Amino acid sequence: MKTKFFLGALTFLLGICLTNAQEPTKAIAVLHPTAGNTVAGSVTFTKSSDEIKVVADITGLTPGKHGFHIHEFGDCSSSDGNSAGGHFNPTRKAHGAPDASDRHAGDLGNVEADASGKAHLEWSDKVMKLSGADSIVGHAVIVHEKADDLKTQPTGNAGGRLACGVIGVAKP
């Protein structure tokens, strides 16, 4: 009888804990340069109703556009960033622009650096998720050498990887 009571109470308490577990509302990737590069910065992802607000601040770039994607693995251990794998694409869609309805979940388009090599980007996205099976948390953000042409499959012809950062849950 005591065992049944204990198991019932334990099940009840676990249910309360799981019900009260909060989904993340903010995530961050701190970008570190790959070998031979000086690109660094941060990208925050903040949940707001039915979308995610993306804010990126990146330095050390050459002036112009640079491809900017979420990649499939949260692994920046290789000196060239290739350990992050390909684009994060849980729904198996074609590569495309960030405003396209059919695109990789990791397609963020381009950041554009000014003459001093700094880029700032702010936009909102309805495809990305901070929780669930298609969550971006635990994956990596990569900044590329060239502009993403938004059409070449599967990567947008964006060239080498200049910086990598793993997306983790941030303090709200």
Language-model segments: residues:
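Bacterial N-terminal signal peptides that target proteins for export
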Residues: 1-8
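Bacterial N-terminal signal peptides
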Residues: 8-17
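N-terminal leader/targeting pre-sequences
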Residues: 17-65, 70-172
